[in-house]
Amino acid sequence: MTTSALRRQVKNIVHNYSEAEIKVREATSNDPWGPPSSLMSEIADLTFNTVAFTEVMGMLWRRLNDSGKNWRHVYKALTLLDYLLKTGSERVAHQCRENLYTIQTLKDFQYIDRDGKDQGVNVREKVKQVMALLKDEERLRQERTHALKTKERMALEGIGIGSGQLGFSRRYGEDYSRSRGSPSSYNSSSSSPRYTSDLEQARPQTSGEEELQLQLALAMSREEAEKPVPPASHRDEDLQLQLALRLSRQEHEKEVRSWQGDGSPMANGAGAVVHHQRDREPEREERKEEEKLKTSQSSILDLADIFVPALAPPSTHCSADPWDIPGFRPNTEASGSSWGPSADPWSPIPSGTVLSRSQPWDLTPMLSSSEPWGRTPVLPAGPPTTDPWALNSPHHKLPSTGADPWGASLETSDTPGGASTFDPFAKPPESTETKEGLEQALPSGKPSSPVELDLFGDPSPSSKQNGTKEPDALDLGILGEALTQPSKEARACRTPESFLGPSASSLVNLDSLVKAPQVAKTRNPFLTGLSAPSPTNPFGAGEPGRPTLNQMRTGSPALGLAGGPVGAPLGSMTYSASLPLPLSSVPAGLTLPASVSVFPQAGAFAPQPLLPTPSSAGPRPPPPQTGTNPFL
């Protein structure tokens, strides 16, 4: 006997439970196995008794309301209730419908054990079965009929069995009951047919039952087969992926073999379709190449239509350009085209060749175009040429002469189109017109300026040519006159009345108070337009000459060094070691020329005395010795 069974027996004695209540407690115990069918059959027989029915149902409702940790009590109570609904009294179903709310609340029963397993699932599933049976009266009636028939058959089978088999069944029932410590083991002699094993009850007794069980098994297997296929697992997905990769690899290998041609096994295989496809492969390749060629040609032609004109028939001239394409000479277009005719400035143009339009980014054709080291060809009049950057007017003509930035102006004959060209890198043509232009433009043997500028020679006077004096390249006199003489329009624009109105007439005109400086007449071209220096010092003109220290000592009436004679004797003034040597003591041979009047007067900038005067400082020093050394 286990500890739990011993504890239950002690509780049964203490609480004085009846025989029906003890059997219900035994069937709904907390043991880890289900209730025995023999014990449930005894409880079902007790439900037909009114007193026992009350005791059975009372203990059963108490077990259904147990706590979560005793979930086995609840589960076994539901199992016993299901059995009583099928084999017990009809009053069991009526009382369950009256207390339907108590059973329905068990749908939310939950309990998770220490291992994290939800044990409430079993209770919730059992509640659903009981509720479905209670709500469907027709099904309940059928279940009761089938259960009663099975019970009667089992009872008749137990009575008709021989004494040997009956003894075996009795001993098996007694051992089965005693192994569980059931109190019904003491009454095994009176109820021996009821204690047959579950295996004996499940085994078919007649051929009809066996046929019925066979059909039931077939139906169950058919239901299992008709169930929908569950989704493939990750392993199945990996297998499918590998299969797809294998198939794609095989298809790729087949394509490679088909492109290889005779080297593939398909070339030797049997099949007219394969050979036909292989024969058509070169045709497809040729067709693809033709399409590619057409596409490339069309794109090149589109670019040529945009940037290059239509091709012209090959000309008969021979080009000296090593990069020139023979036969590629575009036709000329009308003068109204936005891309004017031009020629390559780097290739020589032979005589007798008609100028034709070239690429739009080339330079315009030049009449005197040639290589710097070659001979200048003479070009006949050709078709009219148009400058793409010039005006499109037919009456507009460019200047016929082009300016050479490094040489004299050259004269060129105009083309019929009126455009003149100039090559800055070409050799000047040796025509009569060019020579005349050079003779007119270049300076002649006679000087053309008042003073001919020669870096290594003396200036020579110039003469007039054609009765007029030619301007000098370095003469800035014209520019000085233009700068020093403002225009009348500028004066008119700066009058006060122009921006202040009539009220400005009362203002003082400062221009009338200040006189304009007179322009000095000089022959120096670099000082043209600049005022000459003043002959006198503007800073010392209005100030009287200050007496020097030596003049104050000697009491001389002279006020400054500038007023005294230049050749005064050296002994007329005393010498002080702390003062600079006066200009009057400088010898006459070292004096500056009289024409230099830029320096200010010496008396105006004489330094202040740094030592006290002789009257306050002490005795007078002896006079210095006279000599010719200006530094003593």
UniProtKB/Swiss-Prot annotation:
Basic and acidic residues composition-biased segments: 276-294
A Pfam family per the record: UIM
Database matches in InterPro entries: ENTH (IPR013809), ENTH_VHS (IPR008942), UIM_dom (IPR003903)
Domain UIM: 209-228, 236-255
UniProt entry keywords in alphabetical sequence: Cytoplasm, Cytoplasmic vesicle, Lipid-binding, Nucleus, Phosphoprotein, Repeat
TM annotation in the entry: none
GO CC list: clathrin vesicle coat; clathrin-coated pit; clathrin-coated vesicle; cytoplasmic side of plasma membrane; endosome; extracellular exosome; intracellular membrane-bounded organelle; nucleoplasm
Tissue specificity note: Detected in migrating keratinocytes from wounded skin, but not in differentiating keratinocytes or in normal skin. Detected in chronic wounds, basal cell carcinoma and ulcerative colitis.
List of residues binding a 1,2-diacyl-sn-glycero-3-phospho-(1D-myo-inositol-4,5-bisphosphate): 8, 11, 25, 30, 63, 73
SMART domains per the UniProt record, alphabetical: ENTH (SM00273), UIM (SM00726)
Biased composition (Low complexity): 179-196
GO MF annotations in UniProt: clathrin binding; EH domain binding; phospholipid binding
Description of what induces expression: In keratinocytes, by wounding or contact with collagen.
Phosphoserine PTM positions: 191-192, 264
Swiss-Prot/TrEMBL Sequence repeat ranges: 321-323, 344-346, 371-373, 387-389, 404-406, 524-526, 537-539, 629-631
PANTHER family the record matches: EPSIN-3, EPSIN/ENT-RELATED
Protein name, as recorded: Epsin-3
Source organism of this protein record: Homo sapiens
Gene transcribed to yield this protein: EPN3
